[in-house]
C-alpha cells in the first residue's frame, strides 16, 4: 500500500492529472483515480473530498489533487480530519511539506505549473520523508487543534468583490 496514490482533479487539472497518473505508474506506483475523467466543467470540492476521504480512511497513504491553482483543492482537502494537504509549485516546497509538515496530500495548479515541473514536484514530495523531532511536536499541535475545533467552526465568507482592494469605476473585476 505504501506505493499507492489516490489522484483527483477538476476540469482545469484534468490534463495534468492524466500526465502525472502515467508518471506515477512508470515509477511503480499503484494509482487510484477518483476523477474527473474529462474536460467537462465540474466542481473541485467533489474530487478533493473523494481523495481526502481515501487518505483519511487509510485506504491509501497519499493523495494528489490538481485544479487550476491547487488552492481550492488544498482548502477543501484540509477540511477532512487527518488530512494535511499542501499546495506546492516548486520541488523545495514539496520536500518541506513532507519533511516538516508530514503532508499526506499534494495539490498543484494545472494553470500554474507545466507537466515537467509538476513531475519534479511530485517526485520530490514522494521521495521525501517526515523528519519527526521538533516537527512531530508541531504536527501534534495541529492534530490537537483539529480534534478540538474540527467540524464545529463556521468560516465567514467574504461578500463577492470584497474584502480586498477598492473596486469601482475603471477597475477590473
Language-model region placement:
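A short beta-strand-loop structural module common to alpha/beta enzyme folds
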Residues: 30-41
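C-terminal binding/interaction regions
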Residues: 6-8, 12-13, 91-173
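Short, structured coil segments at secondary-structure junctions
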Residues: 27, 80-81, 101
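Helix-adjacent hinge/juxtasegments
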Residues: 47-87
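Short amphipathic alpha-helical segments
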Residues: 18-21, 75-79, 119
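Phosphate-coordination loops involved in phosphoryl transfer and adenosine-cofactor binding
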Residues: 2, 60, 102
Amino acid at each position: 500500500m505504501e506505493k499507492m496514490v489516490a489522484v483527483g482533479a477538476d476540469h482545469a487539472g484534468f490534463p495534468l492529472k492524466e500526465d502525472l497518473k502515467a508518471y506515477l505508474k512508470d515509477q511503480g506506483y499503484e494509482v487510484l483515480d477518483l476523477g474527473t475523467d474529462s474536460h467537462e466543467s465540474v466542481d473541485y470540492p467533489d474530487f478533493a473530498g473523494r481523495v481526502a476521504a481515501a487518505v483519511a480512511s487509510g485506504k491509501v497513504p497519499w493523495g494528489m489533487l490538481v485544479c487550476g491553482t491547487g488552492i481550492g483543492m488544498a482548502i477543501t482537502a484540509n477540511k477532512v480530519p487527518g488530512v494535511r494537504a499542501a499546495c506546492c509549485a516548486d520541488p523545495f516546497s514539496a520536500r518541506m511539506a513532507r519533511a516538516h509538515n508530514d503532508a499526506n496530500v499534494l495539490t498543484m495548479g494545472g494553470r500554474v505549473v507545466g507537466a515537467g515541473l509538476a513531475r519534479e514536484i511530485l517526485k520530490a514530495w514522494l521521495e521525501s520523508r517526515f523528519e519527526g523531532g521538533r516537527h512531530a511536536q508541531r504536527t501534534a499541535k495541529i492534530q490537537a487543534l483539529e480534534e478540538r475545533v474540527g467540524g464545529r467552526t463556521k468560516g465567514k465568507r467574504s461578500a463577492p468583490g470584497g474584502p480586498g482592494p477598492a473596486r469601482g469605476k475603471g477597475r477590473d473585476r
